Amino acid sequence: MTATRSIAGRAVHPIGLGCMPMSIEGRPAEREAIRVIHAALGHGVELLDTADVYAIGEDDVGHNETLVGRALRAWSGDRARVVVATKGGVTRPGGGWAHDARPEHLRRACEASLARLGIERIPLYQLHAVDERVSIEESVGELARLRDEGKLAAIGVSNVTVEELERARSAAEIVSVQNRLGFYDREPLAGGLAAVCQREGITLIAHSPLGGWKAGGIAHHPLLQAIGRHHGITPHQVVLAWLLARSPAILPIPGASKVDNAIASAGAAAITLAADELAAIEAAAGDHSTLRS
């Protein structure tokens, strides 16, 4: 079993659940989505990642947070062990995506998230994206004020560079960074972000670790298939096990909209790959010539 990860001062299961797929186009019915969340929690997952804008469009904003809140209230297990991580700083004008990290928007977004989630304090609130109109120091400074007011417990940032992370840290304590990281997306590894996070004790939350639309490439990759057959696991589980072995700072949050996928992802924490297998994956990772949709 891979060691737990530390986030916001709490030890959590090394794999979280990305809840976005349960609120966008093609989403499951609410009852099924709640079953997915409960299945993940029942198999040890303790970090649920959401955001106010995980929705089909502008009129649907808040769908995912509302869903997560309902799932938690219906959960018969220990809700105190669950770390809910949400985000603010993005809007959905006309169904598109835009950045708004102005302090006044972040305050409104945080307060709306609290109401939708039905909790008194958000365990981890993340700046969803950097807004070119506002310095990251100003955005994070507002999150620090919200933390001091007791509305959130800890601050994270998302979709940032190493330089932006350092600027954010000058404004407040940053406990996590959430960036895209997976078999086909190695920038946090190649660009030094993962090393900085490991050195500074910051959790690197790997979103889209299974590639999103690139998941088909993972499923059909010859190396990942071969390693998976050897261990009796799927290529997707191979990738998650590789990420966990890559750095103790990395906490993948694979998305799921089906119960079986949520359970399989959580189970990857129990997989140990051999050193030669890890080396082979490392050598192959990032090679888009094998990508197929």
Task: Please tell me what each predicted stretch does.
Residues 1-81, 211:
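N-terminal binding-site loop/beta-alpha segment at the start of enzyme catalytic domains
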Residues 7-25, 85-97, 121, 126:
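N-terminal small/glycine-rich loop or linker at the start of catalytic domains
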Residues 9-11, 42, 70-83, 114-118, ...:
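Acidic (Asp/Glu)-rich catalytic clusters
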Residues 12, 45, 119-122, 152, ...:
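A structural motif
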Residues 24, 54-58, 91-97, 215, ...:
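A short acidic, helix-capping loop that chelates divalent metal ions and anchors anionic groups
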Residues 28-40, 101-117, 161-166:
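Short, acidic/polar
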Residues 114-132:
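Active-site groove signature of glycoside hydrolases
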Residues 130-293:
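Beta/alpha (TIM)-barrel catalytic core signal, keyed to glycine-rich beta->alpha loops juxtaposed to Asp/Glu
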